Each structure stands twice: as C-alpha cells, then as structure tokens.
C-alpha cells in the first residue's frame, strides 16, 4: 500500500448504517475507488464524465487523494454538482497481498469505497484495483448472503444472442468449485441474467470438455444433476454441458464454471480479440490497394471493432454478497470505466442485491420448514433470484 494525501471534501472513517454521513448527492449514487488502477485516477474521472453525460440520474462518491481528485473533477463540466470526494491517505496497489490489505488497509480508497455501500451511502461500488484485495475486503465488509458458500465473479461475454452478451461465471473469485458451488453459480448467474440483461428465463450451460453426460470430472457430473433438478423451480432452462466454442453462441445465456477455467477463458478471449484487431490493421495497411479497401469498408470495420472491443463489456460483478461490487479491469481507460459505471447503474436500478438476498432467504425458510435430503437442501438453500 502506498501513501497519499488525506485532505478531503467529506469526512472519512467508519459510520454505522443508521447514521451515514451526508454527501449531498441525489439520484443513484455509485461509490468509486479512484485509485489503484493501472491508468490512474485521470482515467477513472474521465469515465465518470462519460457516464454522467449519458445519464442525468447518476452521481458519484469518489474515494482517493482529495487534492488530485478535486483538480481532475474541476476540469469536467459534466460532473458539476454530481461528485462528492471522500479523501483517503492510502492506496491498495496491484502488488499488495489481500492479507496485508485486511490488516492495514482501513485508510485506503478501496476500503472506503466498499464501506460506502456497507453504510448505505451508495448502492454499488466500482473499483479498478487489485482483484484479490477487492474480493477479500468485500467479503469481510459486506459479508456473504446467508446460504451462499462461495461468492463468484460474473462477466458479460460478447455473443450471438439478441442482447449481444452472455453471462459467464466464475471468472476468478475462487479457483475451486464443488458441485454445490456450481449449482449456486447457476442460480446466481440466472438472477444476474434476469436483472442485468432482462432475460426472464435464461438458459444455463455447464462448461465441460464435451457435451456428453458421461464426460468430465466427478464434481461436474454431480453439478449437472443438481442444476437439472433445480431448473424447474427456479425459472431457468438447463441445456446441459456446453463446450468452449459455445460460450459466445446463441444456444446458452449463462455459462457456469470454476474460477480457474473461467479466468483462463476470459484472458484468452481478450488476447484473441486484440490479436484479430492487430491482424486486420496489418492486412489493411500492407499495400495501397488494401488501404483503399479499408476506406471502402470503414463503416463495417468500425462496427466490427466496436463489437469485439473488450472495453464495452468491462466490469465483473461480485455475486453472493450483501452489496453489489463491480470490478473494472485494472488497465481500463475512460471508455472502459464508463462501461463499468453503466453496468453498476443498471444493477442498482434493478434492486439486484435485494432480489437475490430475498430469494435466498425464502429458499432457506422453505428448507427449514421440511425434512430435506442433502441434495434437496443444496437446491433449496441456493440463490435463485
């Protein structure tokens, strides 16, 4: 963790949910960790300005070096009257271990941003910072929704679906997942698809090395059966096992996997998209004729570039917590930050966290009211909002 400036326009520190400090903001308030990303606070403030220009109902509680942030915000007319700055004296770097942050991170912008959600000052937290530290702090400060074993990170994946995106989880919260964890991921992913993408009956697929039911590890086969049993009562359709090539397809809406596999798939896709853009650029710049062809195809190429631009789907959502946290890429520029803010606003407007928690509580009561088998308990005690 690195030292910074502690001057701020609003007081920091921990506050009880009953008496949150007044930040004077109206509309949907998003708590933003301005520090810790690879591109610095200028990109974060730039993203806030883009989001503010497109959405008059959004406001920001910004956490970090107050002197630097005040100067950056003052340059953005779109942010006039829509930002309150919470000064902090420390920053979580990409090299900090989660255990270090847990022991000595109370004065960091990340801790302050999460606590704003915990204290009811903001609906959603957005951060470009250290993923491990952000998940650890989120779990400790916000706590898991009762009934959830492991939180997950869900991302939007460009696809052939009508919405243009599929949901994939877990993409990095936990490298391990047993059958009941995968069941809970399916239920949380279905809830995300309903509330984030407006899909009332999402189709769930379990990522495997093949679509045949006899393939895969034992926990995948067990998860297959649990998810299939849960589908009729939880408003989703289970399409069974899917392969890597199905992730961007229109045959599935939510892809469920463990965090190790999901993270590798995500990083591979991002690298492949960058490679395709580089190849196209090289091809159209090779000869005078190819440059002319590029000019003639400019509109189509621009449309393609936008479709595969990873900045458009920037923002992984932490699912299974008593509060919504959106993790932006550490290298996100202003466009990427704006995309994460847009996603945060959509989830805030949908009441996603409350819906998920209410469904889990309802399932828990149903489980407690009758004698259930272990498999039935796994199904009824999971999130299905």
Curated annotation (Swiss-Prot):
It is found in: Cytoplasm. It catalyses: a fatty acyl-[ACP] + phosphate = an acyl phosphate + holo-[ACP]. HAMAP family: PlsX. Belongs to the PlsX family. Catalyzes the reversible formation of acyl-phosphate (acyl-PO(4)) from acyl-[acyl-carrier-protein] (acyl-ACP). This enzyme utilizes acyl-ACP as fatty acyl donor, but not acyl-CoA. Residues 1-17 have a biased composition (Low complexity). Homodimer. Probably interacts with PlsY. Residues 1-28 are annotated as: Disordered. Keywords: Cytoplasm, Lipid biosynthesis, Lipid metabolism, Phospholipid biosynthesis, Phospholipid metabolism, Transferase. GO terms for cellular component: cytoplasm. GO terms for biological process: fatty acid biosynthetic process; phospholipid biosynthetic process. It is an enzyme of class 2 (transferase). GO terms for molecular function: phosphate:acyl-[acyl carrier protein] acyltransferase activity. Pathway: Lipid metabolism; phospholipid metabolism. Its EC number is 2.3.1.274. Pfam families: FA_synthesis. This is Phosphate acyltransferase. Transmembrane segments: none annotated.
